[in-house]
């Protein structure tokens, strides 16, 4: 790529997986253009950095680009993709561009069905504390950077590895992390065996001198371990793990001791609440230790971690109602987030606004979604965020609400759109409530609307 390609066009440039890559490319001196359907904060940030970005997709947006990079959500019948085909411009997925950036550094790829963004961010905090000056590309806004990415001068590139379309197999890291393996992205994988095969291939791609840092507590990971032919470091709470957390205390923050092969490395104080974040922190420590960072430096890095956007993010308080936002959109993520909410704020009534994400996911995991909200006092449910998918007959937010009522005692109200949900907030919320907005789409705007007093 270096010396041959200078002009890059990115379709879906404002997406969580794309904007970080775009920022690094801009900082490397490439000419970056692109398009997105929405004028988001990410788009505005990239424009300030020098990117030329169109709102809306059109063939006329593709002019003299030397390569077109498309996000996972962009289909091959997109007008800009078709224009690139007609012009003979190479078309690549975002993971292939990420692989090119990683090829120039020592790559560390954080994968798994859940927890990738937080784990990558925690790992970045450790590498920053160690003074390694890493390049970092993640799927959320890291508070320490104020963005999804940074270009460093050091030898390491830390990246969130997206398994959703199998393109994480383009990457060639020296250290992998696998946080968990659950059924998801059924629009691509169709069944558990397909996603298992992808993760097996991913873990076996590390070189013989590399390492897979994997969660030994996760049933999906344990199922795959006999087929992994490369080095493995397991982490978790269980006694069989090589890297373990003990004496765990979780409230609004987390505290635990870390043991490696039985040796006590010290105590971690983490601003992130929840046992799932203890596991994420263990993964980050494992990466740090495997790359030669001292244990005390790893622990200091975690203590200084300032959090990441949309991961149990405390947004503010109004009228005695505390508003928290989280990206969780898979039943397993929802369960972890709700457990954390109960642990952090045991005295508050828990009101959840949930926006399902993708028709295919809602259909495939319908039964799990119906049982996921047993732990809430009030559920506000809206329509499915399509994420470029076509509707599936019989699959909707309303059908999910009906399913929840049939299998649980959850008090659920369905709203066709955000306007209707916002209008119901004054009668729904009361002083002392915890109002949790939950989902990978735009549900966070409902919480912000309430805080703004509109």
From Swiss-Prot:
One of its GO terms (cellular component) is cytoplasm. Pfam families: Mur_ligase, Mur_ligase_C, Mur_ligase_M. It catalyses: UDP-N-acetyl-alpha-D-muramate + L-alanine + ATP = UDP-N-acetyl-alpha-D-muramoyl-L-alanine + ADP + phosphate + H(+). One of its GO terms (molecular function) is UDP-N-acetylmuramate-L-alanine ligase activity. Its EC number is 6.3.2.8. ATP binds at residues 112-118. Pathway: Cell wall biogenesis; peptidoglycan biosynthesis. It is found in: Cytoplasm. The keyword RNA-binding does not apply. Keywords: ATP-binding, Cell cycle, Cell division, Cell shape, Cell wall biogenesis/degradation, Cytoplasm, Ligase, Nucleotide-binding, Peptidoglycan synthesis. The keyword Ligase applies. One of its GO terms (biological process) is cell wall organization. It comes from the Bacteria. SUPFAM superfamilies: MurCD N-terminal domain (SSF51984), MurD-like peptide ligases, catalytic domain (SSF53623), MurD-like peptide ligases, peptide-binding domain (SSF53244). It is an enzyme of class 6 (ligase). Belongs to the MurCDEF family. NCBIfam families: murC. Cell wall formation. HAMAP family: MurC. This is UDP-N-acetylmuramate--L-alanine ligase. It comes from Oleidesulfovibrio alaskensis (strain ATCC BAA-1058 / DSM 17464 / G20).
């Amino acid at each position: 790529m270096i010396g041959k390609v200078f002009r890059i066009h990115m379709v879906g440039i404002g997406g969580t997986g794309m904007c970080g890559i775009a920022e690094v490319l801009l900082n490397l001196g490439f000419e970056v253009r692109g398009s997105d359907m929405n004028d988001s904060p990410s788009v505005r940030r990239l424009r300030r950095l020098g990117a030329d970005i169109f709102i809306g997709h059109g063939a006329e947006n593709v002019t003299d680009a030397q390569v077109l990079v498309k996000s996972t959500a962009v289909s091959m019948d997109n007008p800009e993709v078709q224009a690139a085909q007609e012009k003979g411009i190479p078309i690549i997925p975002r993971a292939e561009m990420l692989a090119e950036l990683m090829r120039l550094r020592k790559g560390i790829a954080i994968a798994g069905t859940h927890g990738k963004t937080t784990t990558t961010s925690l790992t970045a905090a450790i590498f920053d504390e160690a003074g390694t000056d890493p390049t970092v590309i993640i799927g959320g806004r890291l508070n320490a950077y104020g963005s999804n990415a940074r270009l460093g001068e050091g030898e390491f590139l830390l990246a969130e590895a997206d398994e959703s379309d199998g393109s994480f197999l383009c990457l060639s890291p020296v250290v992998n992390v696998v946080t968990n393996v659950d059924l998801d992205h059924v629009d691509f994988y169709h069944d558990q065996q397909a996603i298992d095969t992808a993760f097996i291939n991913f873990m076996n791609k590390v070189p013989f001198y590399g390492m897979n840092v994997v969660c030994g507590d996760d049933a999906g990971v344990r199922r795959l371990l006999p087929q992994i032919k490369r080095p493995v470091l397991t982490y978790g709470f269980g006694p069989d793990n090589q890297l373990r957390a003990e004496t765990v205390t979780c409230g609004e923050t987390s505290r635990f001791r870390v043991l490696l092969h039985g040796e006590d490395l010290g105590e971690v104080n983490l601003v992130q609440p929840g046992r799932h974040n203890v596991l994420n922190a263990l993964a980050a420590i494992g990466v740090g230790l495997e790359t030669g960072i001292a244990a005390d430096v790893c622990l200091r890095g975690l203590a200084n971690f300032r959090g990441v956007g949309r991961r149990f993010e405390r947004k503010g308080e109004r009228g005695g109602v505390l508003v928290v936002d989280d990206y969780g959109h898979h039943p397993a993520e929802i369960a972890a987030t709700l457990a954390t909410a109960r642990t952090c704020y045991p005295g508050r009534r828990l009101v959840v606004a949930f926006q399902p994400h993708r028709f295919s996911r809602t259909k495939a995991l319908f039964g799990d979604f119906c049982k996921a909200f047993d732990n809430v006092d009030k559920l506000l449910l809206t329509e499915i965020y399509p994420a470029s998918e076509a509707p599936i007959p019989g699959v909707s937010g309303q059908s999910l609400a009906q399913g929840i009522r049939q299998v649980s005692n959850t008090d659920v109200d369905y709203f066709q759109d955000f306007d209707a949900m916002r209008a119901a907030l004054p009668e729904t919320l009361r002083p002392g409530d915890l109002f949790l907005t939950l989902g990978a789409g735009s549900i966070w705007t409902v919480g912000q609307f309430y805080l703004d007093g509109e």
